[in-house]
Swiss-Prot record:
Pfam families: EF-G_D2, GTP_EFTU, IF-2, IF2_N. Gene3D superfamilies: P-loop containing nucleotide triphosphate hydrolases (3.40.50.300), Translation factors (2.40.30.10), Translation initiation factor IF- 2, domain 3 (3.40.50.10050). It is found in: Cytoplasm. The keyword Protein transport does not apply. NCBIfam families: IF-2, small_GTP. The lineage of its organism: Bacteria, Pseudomonadati, Campylobacterota, Epsilonproteobacteria, Campylobacterales. It comes from Helicobacter pylori (strain G27). Residues 491-494 are annotated as: G3. This is Translation initiation factor IF-2. SUPFAM superfamilies: Initiation factor IF2/eIF5b, domain 3, P-loop containing nucleoside triphosphate hydrolases, Translation proteins. The keyword Ion transport does not apply. Keywords: Cytoplasm, GTP-binding, Initiation factor, Nucleotide-binding, Protein biosynthesis.
Length: 937
């Protein structure tokens, strides 16, 4: 007798709950099976009820159904399966998968001892058993129509299957004893598996497949040697190990702070996802081996849907991540809300660590936002740091070298400051043969010590007489030939206003000749010239001029130079002291020979091939020729027709003239000439670079002009807290707006620097505009709105139209030919605007001996003059116990009853102050006068 199936076990295999028990009982009534809550049923009844619930195949159960022939059962099952097969199941070409047969009762009994497994489908020796709890019955589909030929083929196949079953029964009987012993072990393993399935379960089917018996006897003998129960136990063991590995992985994941996922057992849904590969990890197992007794078949259709859901979920996650990155919205973060400040702080720290690893190349003058970009810093942090340091800047302001170093220290950066001019200059050609070049000699010294006169004597010219005031106010360059060798001389001004000119001359020179008057000695500009030469690291030769005068003392001059660290050769030093006379010409040849010897020692050489590189010594505007510049070539060759640029000026060389007024075609290293063809007057000291064509020259000049314009705008807006407070406090600050026009760039620069040095806390000169050339109407319009504006012209004269416009605008134009006069007049103008210095002069002192209160008059103090003279109307301080209690004027002074103008020391007098009566005995009167003195600049 077969073992009865309990209704509760049946519900567990169907995946039904106790709440759905009534539905199952009603469905059992539909097929003629009366059930109650604790009822039991036979395996045949359970099989038919399972078919009806799961597949919708309705088979009526009769009350005392007689036993049927197995062959007849197989035929009936086949007909039923063919007639009721759902439309969604495709009919296979092989009759093995179309027919259904019922296993022998003995095997079924053994299986029921393991677990209640109602039979769902039977296909040619294959039993499909539902082993999952959450399985829902599929929707019943309309049956397909099957042809008679297919039925006949199925019947033939059924006979073959019957033969296989007979052989299988023999094998089962022989192994029955061994199977009973292993059933208990299999049950324990199955219970362990069910425990894991209750934790994590996916919908699916477990298909128990019996091996088909091979038609030939040799294959049948091999099949008989197999033990199905042993194969099942091995599979259970593998599954157990896999679940243990899964538990370990889940335990590791549980340690991470992630959202806990709900297990399928916690849900009472009627529909569930089917996930075989992820839940049981069957991908790595060969479960489709024909020799195994128990395999799993997957519902691939459901798996595809699951994969699509996973792909859609991944796509949505990617879109959310992209939106979150673009918007930087913390609410888009699915992992939870995080503080935005923490992200910024971590990001900034990472950048700082990257920056520290290598040095950053920063231009010498860089804008604030450019510094932030190069240093990979936040612009707001840079501006905030400068603000805390007392510097108010915007992102477009330029930073000087000191500010860059401060920022580098604040942000712990390693920087290397680069020269700003390097990107605008063309690299010097290194290839080529270096040839000997003439020495460049700069003549420097104090004003009126005879520098230009000495050079005139060397050149046999008289340039000093052509200079206004007999002093040099422009830098001059000349070429002199001596013994077949050329020497280039640069004459620099000696006046203190031309310090920049002397500095430029020292930068381009090879040898410096310091001219000192033997009758005057070392002066201030002499020391300055020596400092320029020392900074340029060039050898110095001293020329002791005016040796023709009587009572000169060259030893005194040498001693003064020795105190400065320049010892003569005849005193054991390194410097040559040559006595010369610019008036008589004595010592000129000796001076030239000394210069040539020094040049031979230095071995001066330069490359003549390639693009020219020259230095602008002076620039001016000449009538008929436009902007001109005096240049000295350092390397390469400058020829007529060459394109060039110098700072903001560019052009093509039209003509070149030497110091003798002769036209030349080529200018080689150490040669000087006056060139024309410039777009504007280049700044003195700028570097002239030869380029291939006009386009490159124009582009480089425009880049430099843009840079300088932005730099000027930045400097005009940049102000510190200290300067701002001074501007607020000094509301009475007086400015004199001026426009400066000069004939040359060097003179213009000297005038500007000299005037700016006159500025002080009370008055200042504001240079609105400066330029080289004549005074124009545009210059007048710049200062027409100011009451005290002045236009200063140096070595230029205004035209008739300009004079008329100046009268119309009420603008003062002043012209000068000597820089002394210009600076002194501007100094006097500033002094007139400044308030005088007030000094006090003590005049007398008197002690109060008695006080008299007179009605309608006031208090009169009876005093004795102890020092000086007390005068009427003079200012006095009333001192009590060493503290000044009142300051005012003496309104009345009497000697007894008479009014007097003053009282001398030792006499008594009566003193009454203006509007003050709180005088007490013992007070002291101290009188004084205020003296106004003019300030000096």
């Amino acid at each position: 007798m077969s073992e009865m199936v309990d209704l509760k076990e049946f519900l567990a295999e169907l995946g039904k709950t106790q709440k759905e028990l009534k539905n199952v009982i009603e469905q059992a009534k539909d097929i003629g099976l009366e059930l109650k809550t604790n009822s039991k049923m036979t395996p045949e009844e359970a099989n038919k009820l399972y078919k009806y619930i799961v597949e919708g195949i309705k088979e009526q159960i009769q009350a005392n159904q007689p036993a049927k022939n197995p062959e007849q059962d197989n035929k009936d099952d086949l007909n039923t399966a063919v007639a009721s097969k759902p439309l969604n199941k495709k009919v296979s070409k092989t009759p093995k998968k179309e027919e259904k047969s019922q296993p022998k009762p003995k095997k079924t009994k053994e299986k029921k001892k393991e677990a209640p497994t109602p039979i769902a489908k039977k296909k040619g020796g294959i039993e499909i058993v539902n082993t999952f709890e959450n399985q829902t019955p599929p929707v019943e589909n309309n049956p397909k129509v099957v042809s008679h030929s297919q039925i006949e083929k199925a019947k033939q196949k059924l006979q073959e299957i019957q033969k296989s079953r007979e052989a299988l029964n023999k094998l089962t009987q022989s192994n029955a004893n061994n199977a009973k012993k292993e059933i208990s072990e299999v049950k324990k393993q199955e219970q362990e598996i069910k425990r894991h399935e209750n934790i994590k379960r996916r919908t699916g089917f477990r298909v128990i497949k019996r091996n088909d018996e091979v038609e030939n006897e040799s294959e049948n003998s091999v099949t008989e040697s197999k033990k199905p129960t042993q194969s099942a136990a091995a599979i259970f063991e593998d599954i157990k190990k896999e679940w243990q590995e899964k538990d370990k992985q889940e335990a590791k994941k549980a340690k991470k702070p992630s959202k806990p996922k709900a297990t399928p057992t916690a849900k009472n849904n009627k529909s569930h996802k089917i996930d075989f590969s992820d839940a049981r990890d069957f991908k790595g197992n060969d479960i489709y081996d024909d020799e195994t007794d128990e395999i799993l078949l997957f519902d691939l259709h459901e798996q595809d849907n699951f994969n699509k859901e996973e792909e859609e979920k991944e796509i949505r996650q990617n879109i959310n991540d992209r939106v979150r990155v673009q918007r930087k919205n913390p609410w888009m973060n699915e992992s939870g809300i995080k503080r935005q400040s923490k992200k910024k702080r971590a990001f900034r720290n990472d950048n700082s660590q990257k920056v520290i690893q290598s040095a950053i190349a920063i231009p010498e003058e860089v804008r604030v936002y450019e510094f932030a970009q190069k240093a990979n810093l936040n612009l707001a942090d840079v501006i905030k740091t400068l603000f805390n340091l007392g510097l108010m800047v915007t992102k477009n302001d330029f930073l000087d070298k000191d500010s860059i170093e401060i920022l580098a220290e604040e942000f712990h950066l390693e920087i290397s400051v680069q020269n700003t001019l390097e990107e605008f200059e063309v690299e010097e050609v290194l290839e080529g043969v270096k040839k000997e070049r003439p020495p460049v000699v700069t003549i420097m010294g104090h004003v009126d010590h005879g520098k230009t006169s000495l050079l005139d004597k060397i050149r046999d010219k008289r340039v000093a007489h052509t200079e206004a005031g007999g002093i040099t106010q422009h830098i001059g360059a000349y070429m002199v030939e001596k013994n077949g060798k050329w020497v280039s001389f640069i004459d620099t001004p000696g006046h203190e206003a031309f310090s920049q000119m002397r500095n430029r001359g020292a930068q381009v020179t090879d040898i410096a000749v310091i001219v000192i008057a033997a009758d005057d000695g070392v002066k201030q500009q002499t020391i300055e010239a020596l400092e320029h030469a020392k900074a340029a690291n060039v050898p110095v030769i001293f020329a002791m001029n005016k040796m023709d005068k009587p009572n000169v003392n060259p030893d005194k001059l040498k001693a003064e130079c020795a105190e400065l660290g320049y010892n003569p050769v005849d005193w054991g030093g390194e410097h040559e002291f040559i006595p010369v006379s610019a008036k008589t010409g004595d010592g000129i040849d000796n001076l030239l020979e000394t210069i040539l010897i020094q040049a031979d020692i230095m071995e001066l050489k330069a490359i003549e091939e390639g693009s020219a590189r020259a230095v602008v010594l002076e620039g001016s505007v000449e009538k008929g020729r436009g902007a001109v510049a005096t240049v000295i070539v350092q390397s390469g060759t400058l020829s007529v027709g060459d394109s060039f640029f110098a700072e903001t000026a560019f052009g093509k060389v039209r003509t070149m003239t030497d110091d003798q007024g002769k036209s030349i075609q080529n200018l080689k290293p150490s040669m000087v000439a006056l060139i024309t063809g410039l777009s504007e007057v280049p700044p003195a000291g700028s570097v002239l670079i030869g380029v291939e064509n006009d386009s490159i020259a124009r582009l480089q000049a425009q880049k430099r002009a843009t840079y300088l314009r932005q730099k000027a705008l930045s400097k005009s807006t940049k102000v510190s807290f200290d300067e701002l407070s001074e501007m607020v406090a000094n509301k009475e600050l007086k400015n004199i707006p001026v426009v400066i026009k000069a004939d040359t760039q060097g003179s213009l620069e000297a005038i500007k620097n000299s005037l700016l040095e006159l500025n002080n806390e009370e008055v200042a000169i504001q240079v609105i505009h400066s330029g080289v050339g004549g005074i124009t109407e545009n210059d007048l319009s710049l200062v027409s709105s100011s009451d005290h504006a002045v236009i200063l012209g140096f070595n230029i004269r205004p035209t008739g139209n300009v004079k008329n416009k100046a009268k119309e605008y009420n603008v003062s134009i002043k012209t000068y030919t000597v820089i002394y006069a210009l600076i002194e007049e501007m100094r006097s103008l500033l002094l007139g605007l400044m308030s005088p210095i007030i000094e006090e002069e003590h005049t007398g002192q008197a002690e109060v001996r008695e006080t008299f209160n007179i009605p309608k008059v006031g208090t009169i103090a009876g005093c004795v003059v102890s020092d000086g003279v007390i005068a009427r109307g003079i200012k006095a301080r009333l001192i009590r116990d060493g503290v000044v209690v009142h300051t005012g004027e003496i309104l009345s002074l009497k000697r007894f009853k008479d009014d007097v103008k003053e009282v001398s020391k030792g006499y008594e007098c009566g003193i009454m102050l203006d509007n003050y009566n709180e005088i007490k005995v013992g007070d002291v009167f101290e009188t004084y006068k205020e003296i106004h003195k003019k300030r000096t600049l």
